[in-house]
Amino acid sequence: MTENLLKEIAKQLNSTKVVGVFCHVRPDGDALGSGLALVTALKNSGKAAYMMCEDAVPDRLKILPAMEDVLTSLPQGVNFDLLVSVDCADLSRLGVFAAFYKKFKGNTVNIDHHISNDRYAKINLVCECTATCEIIPEVIKAAGMSITKDIADLAALGLLTDSGNFSHRDVTENTFKVAAELRGAGADFPGIGYEMFSRQSKNRALLYV
């Protein structure tokens, strides 16, 4: 993760007033967690920020309040200064928003952890790591924004789900370093981990009765 790229993205975030954040179709915990963490940080800093995804939030991921803020269409009457895509390796993964993103006249930022990312934005921060939620906290801090408990929980969701509860081979020392910082900011790793990996549906539980 280069300091120059972080500084450039921080400059873009701080110099704009209205930001659109997009994630990939059929969203997972990392896509939603990273996007909503950034949106929440921007809102806390007095910006207007919107999170958009072609598909609705899956029921199993509706464990954090911010999930209610995800839009499946562009907000009417809003003129964006900056567009940011998260956890999206190529433009087609933005689904119905791909054409809007491609034609946007202002700056676009692409933040992702997939090695296959094709650098489709004007500014691309692509780091090979376990999750985009391993990158987003660094972006937020570089912009001088605070990581609150709400933000930490959202980033924790992405770290947990994309790392398989820290069981995948791409988990590194830095993954745990970021996790420790999020825990220090109040992230409920035990609670989120339970919801994602241990809680059983009623129907599944009945199989053992």
What is the predicted role of each segment?
Residues 111-178:
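Short alpha-helices
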Residues 3-8, 89-90, 140-142:
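Short, motif-level signal for alpha-helix interfacial/capping segments enriched in acidic residues
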Residues 41, 100, 139, 157, ...:
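Hydrophobic/aromatic ligand-binding patch that stacks against planar heteroaromatic rings
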